[in-house]
Amino acid sequence: MQHARKKFRVGRTSSHNRCMLANMLKSLIHYERIETTLPKAKELRRHADKMITLAKKNSLAARRIAIGRLMVRYNKLTSKEARQAKGGDTSVYNVDRLVVNKLFDELGNRFVERKGGYTRILKLQNRIGDNAQKCIIEFLAS
């Protein structure tokens, strides 16, 4: 018997799970709504709520913790991308940087009054190929 087993396991290695959740979390913050399977969404909800709680603190330490959890990599631009940057603003080429800024500037301020439960999961029809339960996970409006 495996009592109190809280690990997220969907048939992948732990490093793959960690990277997959970080990428899904970045997509959720960027688009505020993604479609995925139900087990992934339930695990993603736990991490998303923790990130919003960090964003509500809005401190440098919280920002550094969020960068670590999101596995943000600040990549250097190629010379072509640097030339194409309008007005020298190179941040548009690094989505990870935009995600962290959106998390702390928009989402953190949106949920200041709310104590928890920042996301909702809406169930969809099962996927045709493998009958997996699909769902939409999204941030609440306010």
Swiss-Prot record:
Protein's GO biological process: translation
GO cellular component, one term: cytosolic large ribosomal subunit
The UniProt record lists the keyword Glycoprotein: no
Ribonucleoprotein among keywords: yes
MF-aspect GO terms: structural constituent of ribosome
Domain of life: Bacteria
Assigned keywords, A-Z: Ribonucleoprotein, Ribosomal protein
Disulfide bonds: none
InterPro entries: Ribosomal_bL17 (IPR000456), Ribosomal_bL17_CS (IPR047859), Ribosomal_bL17_sf (IPR036373)
Subunit structure: Part of the 50S ribosomal subunit. Contacts protein L32.
Annotated NCBIfam families: L17
Similarity annotation: Belongs to the bacterial ribosomal protein bL17 family.
Protein name, entry field: Large ribosomal subunit protein bL17
Taxonomic path: Bacteria, Pseudomonadati, Chlamydiota, Chlamydiia, Chlamydiales
Gene: rplQ
